[in-house]
Every structure is written in C-alpha cells, then in structure tokens.
C-alpha cells in the first residue's frame, strides 16, 4: 500500500509537467482509498455507504472527497510542504545551464543584436514618415504593397507546383481535364511529333548536364562578374543546383517544304520547370541573393547547315528562339525585392532582353563543326525578305464600351497590335469608332519564314483592362508566294469584324538596277528626308577593332562600345571590358530611305570614361558601285590612334516588289486559324512581349521602320473595297491612303492610359504655384512675366509627317528653394495625355536660366495637328520623395496657324495654369 501511495504521489509531483495530473486508475474502491492514505476505519460509515447499491449520494461524496484531497496535496507540494515520511523529489535544473548567482539573467549577444535590428527596421520607416512630413497614406500604401507582394509570390509558387505536378504525371492530369490552350503542340498540330524518346534521353543525361552548368557558372560566369567591377571582386556562387526536373520537349517539328536542300530545320517546343537553387554572395558587402525556381517555355529552332559530303556531314549547328520565351523566376535573399509588384515584371523583362540579345531571332548561337571558312556565311545572316504591312482600316467591330451598367451600348476605342516574330508594332488609338481608319505602314524583317506568321490582334482601349476585338493570323509563306495581298480579312474568335490589309513581300536585290524605279515609287527622289518608305536594307556585321587608344587614363584599357547611325536611326553594340582590341561579332540592320544621299556614321566610344576613341563615316553611295554591293575590310578610324582600325562587313540590298499577274478567280490560303487560346492567356502573352525596354544591347533585335507615309498605288481602292462599302467610303479611303500618318514604329511598352499622376497633381501644383506667386508679390508690383519665359521653335515637317518642337531655353524662372531651381520641361500634344505621348527634357541643376536645346517630335499629320494644342510645363525636379517637386509655369500654344509648315521661334510667357492659350505673334 505504501509503495502504491508513493508511486501515486511521485507521479503527481513530477516537475515540469504543465498539464493537470491525471488520477491513477485502480482496480477497486479499497485500493483507491488505500492509495490516498485512508481506509474505512478513518472515515466511519464511508465504506458502508459506498457499497450500498444504487447510492448516488455516496458516489458524489466519494468523488468530491477525492478531488479535495488531490487539491490539498498539490497545494502543499507547491508551497514546499510534504507528508511526513515522504521525500520531496528535487527539481531538475533549467535548460541552458546553471542559474546565475544573485538572479542576474544571461543574455545572448547575437540574439540581442538581431532583436535590435528588427526593432530598428520597424521604427525607421515611422521616423522617416515624420521627418519627411509624409501623410499616413504612405503607411497604407506600404501595407498594400506588402500584401500584394505576398499574394504575387503565393500565386507564383502555386503555378510552379502545378507545373511540377503536370511534369510528374502528365497523363493523369490530362485525363482529369485541362484547357485546350494548356495542351502541348503535338495535340494541336499533326505534323508535330511527341518524341518521348528524346525526353527519356535528356532525363538520362540530366545529371551530367547539371555538372556542365555548374562548371559554366563557377569557371566562366563567376570570373567574368568579378572582373567587371572592383566592387564585385568578392562575388561567388555558394550553391549551383539546377534541380532534379529535366528540360522537357513537348513537341518536335521537322520542315520538309520550302527548305534549302543543304539544311535541316527543327522546331522544339521546350518547357523547363526547375526547382533549382542558385545562391550567390558578395562577401565584401554581406549581400546574399539567389534563385529558387525557374520556368521557361518557348519554341527553339535548331538549324543544321550546311550539309556536306564529309564527316560529320553537318557544317554547323545554329540555335535560337523564334520569339521571346515566357519566363518566370522566384527570387531569394536580397533579390526578393524583385518580387515586389511592379519590379517583378521589370526584372523578368530585363532578363528576357538579355536572353534576346543572344538567343532570339535574328541573334543566334552558332556551333561550328568544321573549319571557319565553311561557316563564315552563317555569321552574316541575310533576311529572306522584308514584309511591308499597310494597316489600313477595319469595319463592323464590336462595341465594347457600355454605360449605365450595360443598359446603354456604346462604341469602342480600337487599336491594333502587329507581330512578326520578335518584332511588335502598335497602331494609334481611334476614339469611339467601330469602323476606324488607321492608314499606317510598318516594315518588318523576315529571317525564317517557315513556321512564322503575321499575327494581328485588335483591342478596345480602356482605363483598366483592354477588351479583345478579334485576331488574325497570316502565313508568311503564302505572302511570299503571292508577293502582294490587298483585301479584307475576317477576324477570328469574334462574331463580327473585318480588317483591311495590304501586304507586300519585298525581295532583297544584290544590284542597283531597280533602285531608281524603287525611289520613284516611294517618292524618295524628290527630297532628302531620312525617313519614309524604305528603298533598301543595310546589313552590317561588326567584327572587331585593333589598336584602340586608351581613355583618359593612359595606363588603363578602355571599355569600347560602337555606336552606329543612319540618319536619325541609331544602334549600339555590346560593351567589351578592359581591352583595346575588342571582338564583337554582332549583326545590325538599318532600313534606308535613299542610299544615294545617306551615310553610315560609326563611332567607337569608351563607356567607362565617356570619351570618343575614333569615328568613321561611310557614304552609302560607295556601296552602290561595289561588287555585289558588299564591302568587307578594315576601316581606318579618324580622330584616333595612327593604327586604329575597325573591321566590318557592310552589304546593301534594294527592296524590290515583284508583281505577279493573277487570274480574277485566284484563291489563296494566306489566312490560317490559330490554336484555341484563352483571351486572358493571349493578353498576358502580348503584355509580356511588349513590356520592358531594350537593354544596352537590345538594338541587335531586328529593327523596324516607323509608321510612314503611304503610297498612291493605282487600283488600290477598287481592289480592296468591301462588299458593303459605298462610294463615299472609297473616296475616304483614297484620300486617307495617300497620306499615311506617322506614329512610333517598333514599340516595347504599351501604355494606353493617361498619366494619372499628372492629372492628380496638376490642381495641387497650380494652387501651390499661385501661393508662391503671392508670396513673391508681397506688396510689390511684379513684371509682365513674373514666372519667366520659355523659348520654343515649332514647325511641322511634311516630309516626316511630324510636329517638331525644339526647346531652346528658359529665363527669369522663380527660385524653388534657397539653391535656386532644378528645372526641366514636360510637353503633351493635347488632348493626348498618355504617358507614351509625353516628352521631357533633361534636368538643369541649380539655375534660373536653363539652356536645353533639345528637339522632340510628335507623329501627327498637318490637318490633325492644327486642331490640337501644345501643353508645355516647366517643372522643378527633386529627389525621390522630395518636397521640392513642383510647377514653375505653364504655357498652352494653339497650333491652328497657317505658318505651321514654315515654323517659328518665339519666347512665351509662363503662367500659373496655362489657361490662356498663346498663338504665334
């Protein structure tokens, strides 16, 4: 009995037990009473009452007594009391070591520093808000941004998990049901093979591919990054793990038609969903960053050429993407900042631009398998042709704008997006019109027409999300066969709508026999303009340079970069670091308006010290008399060292339209049906291709011409009239097609909505300027121009079809702070206040009489510009979150003047709101 009691007491007094002790279970009531130290003799009558059958009162009393005894013993144990004869179990020592004498607590220094750092990070934004005098709305904005960031990262992780699940069990996922747009290419196209044997081969080779990639990162990329900048001297990859999921090939297509007999063309639909871990560190700045997952999807073309009669039967291997692939990256460490909404799309776009500079058509990776002599032609790719797209008009489009929650149907604000491979164009927006007339022309290079299509999509511009109005896809092989297509095409994926296009396939001629005729057709023989319809194509292969002089420091090697320009079109090569004998091996193309009057200007610059290392000017007329209109040699640089040369290969090709006679009942199959794609996916894809700006080497992408003047082709109106077009429509078409409007050509960012920030800040800035003006007056009489003046030159160029505005200078501006002002000029061509229509000068620091001398242009015709107003605002620039930003003055210039074609230069008075339009005086 004593042993049972001690065991029961010790179990209840076990130190460290946080839960309420359970009552020990006994076989009988006598054992239960003995365990608690009493029997029936100590409590007379208890045993008899407890054994009485059906006694509910006895049961309740027994339970109450037992609970009271347990509570009494527990209170005694907590107060240091114990029953006589029972030893109290010693308390075990606390984890973490013995207790400190005198009750002094031990504090870990790293933990304390971490806690202080977290507290500082939390309190610093609060202090900054108070110091900068910002409102509480910034806190709400930060919280919203944080929530958006977490949601974005969660969605990205969810997409990664779905993609991994699809790769692991593709058959089960397909059987459960997926959308048609998510299926691989071999499901949609019968000529695309699944080639599962290739995936099995890649899976077996994947561990060795990972070893090669790790060596590439550690032995090639890491030393290159360290040598690029002294601040990156401690850069290193701490972990390079590409992951266990191999690259997957969803379909393979081999071209057998319209292919040279000495080449093999394959299209691989690749998909990589990798749970990779790539971590990097810059020890000097305690900076850690990395990538934890990557997704990339796209169509990669592999060309085996030339086929030869000797082993290995293939001269070289060329690899490139037909268009920018889809990319998604999950960042870790410091690069988590790139997952912030707004920055995540920008970071992915920058990486895509870097990939495009090496792997997107016309850029390619060429792996020679034989001697350099046989593959020299591969490093100088010549386009198969040039596609001239006349984007004329549309009819019977859907009305997407509604009012009163859909009760009243309105019209649409249509615009078009045209894509040829990696080249994307966007038309201007026609407000509230279901039969818009654009009358715009684009020119695009076509390097690989098998497998490439002309894709056109129409959208209705809205402030929040643009609505889909229809699409069109045209096979470029059929356009090449027809040479000229001028007709109405029915829009796909919508119930109604037609689009009028004129497509011209221009052949590249290696002689100048047809040049005079081409110049006459495009009206380039009557002016010296540098833009307009193109008559020729300039192809330039930049090879290398030798014996370049040093920069400003004689002992250091320069970082050479080459800038090339023809007229107002300029392109730039990649930067080669720390060398005076750089090797570029890059290709560039320029559309030429009139080769008889235009020159190629080349300048080699030191990017580090921003100085010129030499320049060169090549008249294009020299190429007209050269053999095959091609020159390949080393050119002597001017204003450079005595032996400084640059090696280039330059070729000129005349753009010739070969017209073919067709019977009246001739049919073609140019329009093709696109695979079923969700509208949401389509819009996302287009945005991903149009977002971002080219990087430093982004000019290598095949350039496109701006929208330019049209042509007066005989019979164009009669051939292109739709069934329901009337005489008035034909008259309008003939009138509008004779003067095609100009607008930006190759675009990279689609920003249709107005600049909201400017609209919101305008009333506030005007009010602040009026208060500042009253403070300046303060009982004194101000002059005629209290806010100062601005000098502008305004004219309209009929040759370029553009409004040209030259901002010369400002004088007598007001001081925005004690140090003066940091003025710059912002312009809009009202009523267009979109961000893409904004023009800005550079900022002049700490001056009240800045000199800008900068020229800007707006693509608009003369009749239209005379109905518009030029909005010019002089503003003060400040740093990020600075209080010194504000308006210095405005002026509105009415352009309804007959002298606009001649132009004028004038000083304009600045006012606080610019509400008084000023015309030419």
Curated annotation (Swiss-Prot):
This is Extended synaptotagmin-2. Keywords: Calcium, Cell membrane, Endocytosis, Endoplasmic reticulum, Lipid transport, Lipid-binding, Membrane, Metal-binding, Phosphoprotein, Repeat, Transmembrane, Transmembrane helix, Transport. Ca(2+) 1 binds at residues 400-401, 460, 462, 467. PROSITE patterns: C2 (PS50004), SMP (PS51847). The keyword Glycosyltransferase does not apply. GO terms for molecular function: cadherin binding; calcium ion binding; calcium-dependent phospholipid binding; identical protein binding; phosphatidylcholine binding; phosphatidylethanolamine binding; phosphatidylinositol binding. Changing residue 413 to A: Abolishes calcium binding. Residues 369-489, 514-639, 786-908 form the C2 domain. It comes from Homo sapiens (Human). It is a peripheral membrane protein; Multi-pass membrane protein. The gene is ESYT2. The lineage of its organism: Eukaryota, Metazoa, Chordata, Craniata, Vertebrata. It comes from the Eukaryota. Anchored to the endoplasmic reticulum membrane by a transmembrane hairpin structure; both N-terminus and C-terminus are cytoplasmic. The C2 domains mediate lipid and calcium binding. The N-terminal C2 domain binds calcium ions and is important for calcium-dependent lipid binding and interaction with membranes. Two calcium ions are bound at a high-affinity site and a third calcium ion is bound with lower affinity. May bind up to four calcium ions. In contrast, the second C2 domain apparently does not bind calcium. The third C2 domain mediates interaction with membranes enriched in phosphatidylinositol 4,5-bisphosphate and is required for location at the cell membrane. Ca(2+) 2 binds at residues 401, 413, 460-462. It is found in: Cell membrane; Endoplasmic reticulum membrane. Changing residue 466 to A: Impairs binding of the third calcium ion, but has no effect on the binding of the other two calcium ions. The chain crosses the membrane at residues 104-124, 128-148. Tethers the endoplasmic reticulum to the cell membrane and promotes the formation of appositions between the endoplasmic reticulum and the cell membrane. Binds glycerophospholipids in a barrel-like domain and may play a role in cellular lipid transport. Plays a role in FGF signaling via its role in the rapid internalization of FGFR1 that has been activated by FGF1 binding; this occurs most likely via the AP-2 complex. Promotes the localization of SACM1L at endoplasmic reticulum-plasma membrane contact sites (EPCS). Residues 191-370 form the SMP-LTD domain. Residues 1-103, 660-754 are annotated as: Disordered. The modification Phosphoserine is found at residues 691, 693, 736, 738-739, 743, 748, 755, 758, 761.
């Amino acid at each position: 009995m004593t042993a049972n009691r001690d065991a029961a007491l010790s179990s209840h007094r076990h130190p460290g037990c946080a839960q309420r002790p359970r009552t020990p279970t006994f076989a009988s009531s006598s054992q239960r009473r003995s365990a608690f130290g009493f029997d029936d003799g100590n409590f007379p009558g208890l045993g008899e009452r407890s054994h009485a059958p059906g006694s509910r009162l006895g049961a309740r009393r027994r339970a109450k007594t037992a609970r009271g005894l347990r509570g009494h013993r527990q209170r005694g144990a907590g107060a240091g009391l114990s029953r006589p004869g029972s030893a109290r179990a010693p308390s075990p020592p606390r984890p973490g070591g013995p207790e400190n004498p005198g009750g002094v607590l031990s504090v870990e220094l790293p933990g304390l520093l971490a806690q202080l750092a977290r507290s500082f990070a939390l309190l610093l934004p609060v202090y900054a808000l108070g110091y900068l005098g910002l409102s509480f709305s910034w806190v709400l904005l930060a919280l919203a941004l944080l929530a958006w960031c977490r949601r974005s990262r969660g969605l990205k992780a969810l997409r990664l998990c779905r993609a991994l699940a699809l790769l692991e069990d593709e058959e089960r996922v397909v059987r459960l049901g997926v959308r048609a747009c998510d299926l691989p290419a071999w499901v949609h196209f019968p000529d695309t093979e699944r080639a599962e044997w290739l995936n099995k081969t890649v899976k077996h080779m994947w561990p060795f591919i990972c070893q090669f990639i790790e060596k590439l990162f550690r032995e090639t990329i890491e030393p290159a990054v360290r040598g690029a900048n002294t601040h990156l001297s401690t850069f290193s990859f701490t972990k390079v793990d590409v992951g266990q999921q191999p690259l997957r090939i969803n379909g393979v297509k081999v071209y057998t038609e319209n292919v040279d007999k000495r080449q093999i063309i394959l299209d691989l639909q690749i998909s990589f969903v990798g749970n990779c871990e790539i971590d990097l560190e810059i020890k000097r700045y305690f900076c850690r960053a990395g990538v934890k997952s990557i997704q990339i999807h796209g169509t990669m073309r592999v060309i085996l050429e030339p086929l030869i009669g000797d082993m290995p039967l293939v001269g070289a291997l060329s690899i490139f993407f037909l268009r920018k692939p889809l990319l998604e990256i999950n960042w870790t460490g410091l690069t988590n900042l790139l997952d912030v909404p707004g920055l995540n799309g920008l970071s992915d776009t920058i990486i895509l631009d870097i990939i495009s500079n090496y792997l997107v058509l016309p850029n390619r990776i060429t792996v020679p398998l034989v001697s350099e002599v046989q593959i020299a032609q591969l490093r100088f790719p010549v386009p198969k042709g040039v596609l001239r797209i006349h984007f004329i008009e549309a009819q019977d489009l859907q009305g997407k704008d509604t009012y009163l929650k859909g009760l009243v149907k309105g019209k649409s604000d249509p615009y078009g997006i045209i894509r040829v491979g990696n080249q994307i164009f966007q038309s201007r927006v026609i407000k509230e019109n279901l039969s818009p007339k654009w009358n715009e022309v684009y020119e695009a290079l076509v390097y690989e027409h098998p497998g490439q299509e002309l894709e056109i999509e129409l959208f209705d511009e809205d402030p929040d999300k643009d609505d889909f109005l229809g699409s069109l896809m045209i096979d470029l092989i059929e356009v090449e066969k027809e040479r000229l297509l001028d007709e109405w095409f029915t829009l796909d994926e919508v119930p109604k709508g037609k689009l009028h296009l004129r497509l011209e396939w221009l052949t590249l001629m290696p002689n100048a026999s047809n040049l005079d005729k081409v110049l006459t057709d495009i009206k380039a023989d009557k002016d010296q303009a540098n833009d307009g319809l193109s008559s020729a194509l300039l192809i330039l292969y930049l090879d290398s340079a030798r014996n370049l002089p040093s920069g400003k420091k004689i002992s250091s090697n320069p970082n050479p970069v080459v800038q090339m320009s023809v007229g107002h079109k300029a392109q730039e090569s990649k930067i080669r670091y720390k060398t005076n004998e750089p090797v570029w091996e890059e290709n560039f193309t320029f559309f030429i308006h009139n080769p008889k009057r235009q020159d190629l200007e080349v300048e080699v610059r030191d990017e580090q010290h921003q100085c010129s290392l030499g320049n060169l000017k090549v008249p294009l007329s020299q190429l007209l008399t050269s053999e095959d209109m091609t020159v390949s040699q080393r050119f002597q640089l001017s204003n450079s060292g005595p032996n400084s040369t640059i090696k280039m290969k330059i070729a000129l090709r005349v753009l010739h339209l070969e017209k073919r006679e067709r019977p009246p009942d001739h049919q073609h199959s140019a329009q093709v049906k696109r695979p079923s794609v969700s509208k949401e996916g389509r819009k996302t894809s287009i945005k991903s291709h149009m977002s971002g700006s080219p990087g430093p080497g982004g000019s290598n992408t095949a350039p496109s011409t701006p929208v330019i003047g049209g042509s007066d082709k005989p019979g164009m109106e009669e051939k292109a009239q739709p069934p329901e077009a009337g005489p008035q429509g034909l008259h309008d078409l003939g009138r509008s097609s004779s003067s095609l409007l100009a607008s930006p050509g190759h675009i990279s960012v689609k920003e249709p909505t107005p600049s909201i920030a400017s609209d919101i800040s305008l009333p506030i800035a005007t009010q602040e300027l009026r208060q500042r003006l009253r403070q300046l007056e303060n009982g004194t009489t101000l002059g005629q121009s209290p806010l100062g003046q601005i000098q502008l030159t305004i004219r309209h160029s009929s040759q370029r079809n553009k409004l040209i505005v030259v901002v010369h200078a400002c004088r007598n501006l007001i001081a925005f702070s004690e140090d003066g002002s940091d003025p710059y000029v912002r312009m809009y061509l009202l009523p267009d206040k979109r961000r893409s229509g904004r023009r800005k000068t550079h900022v002049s620091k700490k001056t009240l009489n800045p000199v800008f001398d900068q020229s800007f242009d707006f693509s608009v015709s003369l009749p239209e510009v005379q109905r518009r107003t030029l909005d010019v605002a002089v503003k003060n620039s400040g740093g990020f979150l600075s209080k010194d930003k504000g308006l210095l003055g405005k002026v509105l210039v009415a352009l309804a003047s007959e002298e606009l074609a001649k132009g004028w230069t004038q000083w304009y008075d600045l006012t606080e709101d610019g509400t008084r339009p000023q015309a030419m005086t």
